[in-house]
Amino acid sequence: MTVKTRFAPSPTGYLHVGGARTALYSWLYAKNQGGEFVLRIEDTDLERNSQEAVDAILEGMEWLGLEWNEGPYFQTQRFDRYNEMVDKLLEEDKAYKCYASKELLDEVRAEQEANKEMPRYDANHPKIKAANEAAKDGEPCVIRFRNPKEGSVVFDDQIRGRIEISNTQMDDLIIRRTDGSPTYNFCVVVDDWDMGITHVVRGEDHINNTPRQINIYEALGAPVPTFAHCAMILGDDGAKLSKRHGAVSVMQYRDMGYLPAALNNYLVRLGWSHGDQEIFTQEEMINLFSLNAVSKSASAFNTDKLQWLNNHYIKNSDPAYVAEHLQWHLDQQKLDVTNGPAITEVIKLVGERCNTLVELAEQIGYFYEDFAEFEAGAAKKHLRGVAKEPLELALAKAEALTEWTTANIKDGVIAAVCEELEIGMGKIGMPLRVAVTGGGQSPSVDAVMELIGKERCVARIKMALEFIAEREANA
């Protein structure tokens, strides 16, 4: 048997982190088993669906790198197939027409609540029975599935263990509306059957749907897939994760500067573990993942831990991979990195100081763009008269360097200035940093100067000396 899993979101909004984790688990299980992963868009809610939401889901999946083998399939393109199966159940008396109006059903429900009974559809209720018997062919009706009245539905959930639900707890659900459109629970079953889905990985909010769907599988003579229901994700306050906890959309995390590898690593650990290991390559995730190692308890989303992971991936990933995802942020800042050092070299130097790609993009402008003025605080503190002589000597030695390397800048410029003027490193290091970067924070100034380049460094040191001269003249 070829394992086949699916991710089946509804296009009523963005791809949120809970859905992304479900997709990741489903994708990983298929990969682990040498199987296939299907993407299906469950768009039967015609009033709430939007193309914008479809695009957001596809964009999120592609950004996370969760490639699908089949799809995306759209349920709205399969209505003929669903109706064919509804008619099959009608012919076999496994479904029936119901003519009870919404008003009548509300009235019956109110009676049940008044009698302290569980509100539910009851085909044998005198009022409902009378409505169905009095109806004439051609009148608007829904089609209901004839749920078994005896026995139980039992299934072995791969995460939660054995689950048993009595058929007496389930009523006859609607499988086709009065407008002829099929309903969610029915479409899902037909889709999973037609697409050969063997394992259904989804959120625990679907547990109540599962016994109903199993009864429909069996009524159709379809194989019942194996189910795995993931626990919910909570915010750090213990409440269900929502917009009030901050970002919940996958693409919001892209916008905030997270790498997809970091988010995937974080999401896989929100419920699944392999010993004490925290960091997993994609290959390790695929090789080690199993559904029975997923916790049935809810997990709390911790942004600090995600940020720590993101910093790890920025520092330790192939700089070309980081550069690929950094480009979007550079575009947002309109920073052209073609006029300067290789972006991969800048990432290697600056990346370890950054928790997000937003921070990284904000910190590297001076490698590529000249600045008209220095940061006020840094200039006030470090570009003073006392820095004039060290910077003048540094300028002369920089201009004299024939090989512009970190080692030569360190020894032939910075160390040489300290030795000749008999000053400490701080007397030249900080003024030089402000001169060449425009601010007071950067990685090692000799390495920064190598990447900025000799011509730019010389011009910027001259600019700093002009700033000092003007400052002294106005003192």
Swiss-Prot record:
InterPro entries: aa-tRNA-synth_I_cd-bd (IPR045462), aa-tRNA-synth_I_codon-bd_sub2 (IPR020751), aa-tRNA-synth_I_CS (IPR001412), aa_tRNA-synth_I_cd-bd_sf (IPR008925), Glu-tRNA-ligase_bac/mito (IPR004527), Glu/Gln-tRNA-synth (IPR000924), Glu/Gln-tRNA-synth_Ib_cat-dom (IPR020058), GluQ/Sye (IPR049940)
One example of a Gene Ontology biological process annotation: glutamyl-tRNA aminoacylation
Enzyme class: ligase
PROSITE patterns per UniProt: AA_TRNA_LIGASE_I (PS00178)
Location of the motif 'KMSKS' region: 240-244
Signal peptide: none
Subcellular compartments: Cytoplasm
Motif annotated as 'HIGH' region, chain positions: 9-19
UniProt binding sites for ATP: K243
Protein name: Glutamate--tRNA ligase
Species: Vibrio campbellii (strain ATCC BAA-1116)
Lineage: Bacteria, Pseudomonadati, Pseudomonadota, Gammaproteobacteria, Vibrionales
Record gene name: gltX
